[in-house]
């Protein structure tokens, strides 16, 4: 299924209220995230490369908040012949429907199980890789520690958690600089001032970012002794944590 161009916020007053991963967003999400998140394609490709290095035969992989299935597809392409299973989980039915359609276009011997569920209710077992690709930031902050602790418990020794997030910064000047660079990135990708403003208003109470230090502290408290940044562009970053 092809993705449409993102024009959801192109007209004044469109889609007022909090941002939701509904059918309208699902239809344009592929275009939206590439034009909004610097380095997104690199992150997706590297998720596949990390999977190639860490997914062990017969183990489980969890893609939490799988959206359109980009990470799931990148992983599946790299782990053929390992008898591993991928659980692609999202609480948005429109997203999950499109993810399943997207992956059905490619033949693979790796089983993918699509689950319409709240990732906070997910159990983890025999996991070699868990992916939270721009997902944790949408959970209530009070629920984040518990989820990461459960992920850690379900990972096999040597298993990896890959965590991508939008960051906030303690330094006011640094925050302003990186926000400015990110805005220019979106302008360069064709978003108007109106679109940028309206989406910001819709998402600011839904996406609640943490600092890098908060992420590292949370991962350490969950049990990870090795957790560090592997990618950052402006205020978007990805971390790898190894059990």
From Swiss-Prot:
It holds the Pfam family Methyltransf_25. SUPFAM superfamilies: S-adenosyl-L-methionine-dependent methyltransferases. Homodimer. Belongs to the class I-like SAM-binding methyltransferase superfamily. Cx-SAM synthase family. InterPro entries: CmoA, Methyltransf_25, SAM-dependent_MTases_sf. This is Carboxy-S-adenosyl-L-methionine synthase. PANTHER family: CARBOXY-S-ADENOSYL-L-METHIONINE SYNTHASE, TRANS-ACONITATE 2-METHYLTRANSFERASE-RELATED. It comes from the Bacteria. It comes from Shewanella amazonensis (strain ATCC BAA-1098 / SB2B). HAMAP family: Cx_SAM_synthase. One of its GO terms (biological process) is tRNA wobble uridine modification. One of its GO terms (molecular function) is carboxyl- or carbamoyltransferase activity. It catalyses: prephenate + S-adenosyl-L-methionine = carboxy-S-adenosyl-L-methionine + 3-phenylpyruvate + H2O. NCBIfam families: carboxy-S-adenosyl-L-methionine synthase CmoA, PRK15451.1. The keyword Transferase applies. Keywords: S-adenosyl-L-methionine, Transferase. Catalyzes the conversion of S-adenosyl-L-methionine (SAM) to carboxy-S-adenosyl-L-methionine (Cx-SAM). Its EC number is 2.1.3.-. The keyword S-adenosyl-L-methionine applies. S-adenosyl-L-methionine binds at residues 40, 65-67, 90-91, 118-119, 133, 200.
